[in-house]
From Swiss-Prot:
Heterotrimer of A, B and C subunits. It comes from Variovorax paradoxus (strain S110). InterPro entries: Asn/Gln-tRNA_amidoTrfase_suB/E, Asn/Gln-tRNA_Trfase_suB/E_cat, Asn/Gln_amidotransferase, Asn/Gln_tRNA_amidoTrase-B-like, GatB, GatB_C_1, GatB_Yqey_C_2, Gln-tRNA_amidoTrfase_suB_CS. It is an enzyme of class 6 (ligase). NCBIfam families: gatB (TIGR00133), PRK05477.1-2 (NF004012), PRK05477.1-4 (NF004014). The gene is gatB. GO terms for biological process: glutaminyl-tRNAGln biosynthesis via transamidation; translation. HAMAP family: GatB. It catalyses: L-glutamyl-tRNA(Gln) + L-glutamine + ATP + H2O = L-glutaminyl-tRNA(Gln) + L-glutamate + ADP + phosphate + H(+); L-aspartyl-tRNA(Asn) + L-glutamine + ATP + H2O = L-asparaginyl-tRNA(Asn) + L-glutamate + ADP + phosphate + 2 H(+). Belongs to the GatB/GatE family. GatB subfamily. Allows the formation of correctly charged Asn-tRNA(Asn) or Gln-tRNA(Gln) through the transamidation of misacylated Asp-tRNA(Asn) or Glu-tRNA(Gln) in organisms which lack either or both of asparaginyl-tRNA or glutaminyl-tRNA synthetases. The reaction takes place in the presence of glutamine and ATP through an activated phospho-Asp-tRNA(Asn) or phospho-Glu-tRNA(Gln). This is Aspartyl/glutamyl-tRNA(Asn/Gln) amidotransferase subunit B. It holds the Pfam family GatB_N.
Length: 476
């Protein structure tokens, strides 16, 4: 961008879907009255000790299995020391030197180009409370309901080179954590929060100074914030100034980032092993028990579609955007649909209507069985493609529920009278002398105009492939 290379890395906090907190039995339910879900452990009262939540560990194992990571047989919890009003202990329990999940990668498509972002680690930690600044005059309120909520912080290498790539990575990671059920992915409630580390440099130069954009809680704001930060840093460098390392917040009202604090280094937090928690031991048998509970992963499902149905990797990736979408496709194929045709309709006409109405495929008025019947009629030649959209529309609006009945009621069967079709062909050729001349002169595209005229004259009942062949024969 503007002669600079963009370098982006991500830190994502995924709130784990446990019913209780990571080191206490207090509830993690969202939306309760302030300070009604904070127990003695969360409040750091004297004499309390943390007790590890087994469910949080198993969710971390699931992520490691999903991303091809190494799951550490022994990991250690550490105290991350800093002062903030909503952190009762004066430190956060996290992992530093030996995280539970190490390495791995997230692969995704940017357009039709396959990308891979490497992971450094994913570590377990507790969330802090929340400072409330609204409805208070001259002071702030503290809500400790969130204190101790289990988080998995997922850290990438600085592998992303554009805003689009960064957002695509975040969407893919969001898909994975919700697919395997370790996080509900609700960005509005803070269940999936992303921090983007952004820097720029001239090609071939050493890495530039990075600035961290905190708590991006929507993909739209993520794009706007990263774009603004990139341009801001380039402007600073072009004006001869240095980039200062800092943590910034994005203001969606102004579309700008503002400095929150100068960025700390690890030494500022004075990490040391937590003496109240023993090392976390994860045996191979435990990993295998967790593996047995895992659903088929989107990556494995996409590979199956490529292998069994002869799909492209891109089409397979589109169909595995969510478990519900993949399930719909599988149900259509089980009902007899040709995989390629079913894929085209699901990612084409179906997706267009779902997006327009802002609903998921679970709420689609056309069932997988109805779609299978529809594409079956296209495949056997009973229904031309353009007429198929009329049938789909009737199914979608509820005007009909049986494909064959709709075809019959709307008289959509293809022309069987070859004499009538031949007369239409002759009329179209006679009325479109210019197209005929251009086609005979070597312009293949001119034939498309003639085919379109025949389809229009036949009321969409002619078979386009048959029309094309007949026209070629007539025009020599």
């Amino acid at each position: 961008m503007r002669g600079y290379e963009v370098i982006i890395g991500f830190e994502t906090h995924a709130q784990l879907s446990t019913a209780s907190k990571i080191f206490s039995r207090a509830s993690t339910a969202f939306g309760a009255e302030p300070n009604t879900q904070a127990c003695a452990v969360d409040l750091a009262l004297p004499g309390t000790l943390p007790v590890m939540n087994k469910g949080a560990v198993e969710r971390a194992i699931k992520l490691g299995l999903a991303l091809g990571s190494h799951i550490a047989p022994r990991s250690v919890f550490a105290r991350k020391n800093y002062f903030y009003p909503d952190l009762p202990k004066g430190y956060q329990i996290s992992q530093y030197e030996i995280p539970v999940v190490q390495g791995g990668a997230v692969s995704f498509f940017l357009g039709e180009e396959k990308k891979t972002v490497r992971l450094v680690r994913a570590h377990l930690e507790e969330d802090a409370g929340k400072s409330l600044h609204e409805n208070f005059i001259g002071q702030s309120g503290i809500d400790l309901n969130r204190a101790g909520t289990p988080l998995l912080e997922i850290v990438t290498e600085p592998d992303m080179r554009s805003t689009a790539e960064a957002v695509a990575y975040a969407r893919e990671l969001h898909k994975i954590v919700t697919w395997i059920g370790i996080c509900d992915g609700n960005m509005q409630e803070g269940s999936f929060r992303c921090d983007a580390n952004v820097s720029v440099r001239k090609p071939g130069e050493k890495l530039g100074t990075r600035r961290e954009i905190k708590n991006l809680n929507s993909f739209k704001f993520m794009q706007q914030a990263i774009d603004y930060e990139i341009n801001s840093q380039i402007n600073e460098l072009e004006d001869g100034r240095k980039i200062e390392q800092a943590t910034v917040l994005f203001d969606p009202d102004t579309g700008e980032t503002r400095t929150m604090r100068t960025k700390e280094d690890a030494a500022d937090y004075r990490y040391f092993p937590d003496p109240d928690l023993p090392p976390l031991a994860i045996e191979a048998e435990w990993i295998e028990r967790v593996r047995a509970t895992m659903p088929e992963l989107p990556r494995a499902m996409a590979e199956r579609y490529v292998r069994d149905h002869g799909m492209s990797e891109y089409d397979a990736a589109q169909l595995t955007q969510s478990p519900a979408l993949a399930r719909y496709f599988d149900d259509a194929v089980k009902a007899g649909a040709t995989p390629k045709l079913a894929s085209n309709w699901i990612t084409g006409e179906m997706a267009r209507r779902l997006n327009a109405q802002e609903i998921g495929i679970e709420a689609a008025p056309v069932t997988a069985q109805q779609l299978a019947q529809l594409v079956g009629r296209i495949a056997d030649g009973t229904l031309p493609n353009n007429a198929a959209r009329q049938v789909f529309d009737a199914l979608w609006t509820g005007e009909g529920s049986d494909v064959d009945a709709i075809i019959e009621a709307r008289d959509l069967k293809p022309m069987s009278d070859t004499g009538a079709l031949d007369r239409i062909l002759d009329e179209v050729i006679a009325k479109n002398a210019k197209n005929v001349e251009e086609y005979r002169g070597g312009k293949e595209k001119a034939l498309n105009g003639l085919v379109g005229q025949v389809m229009k004259a036949s009321g969409g009942k002619a078979n386009p492939a048959q029309v094309t062949e007949l026209l070629k024969a007539k025009l020599g």
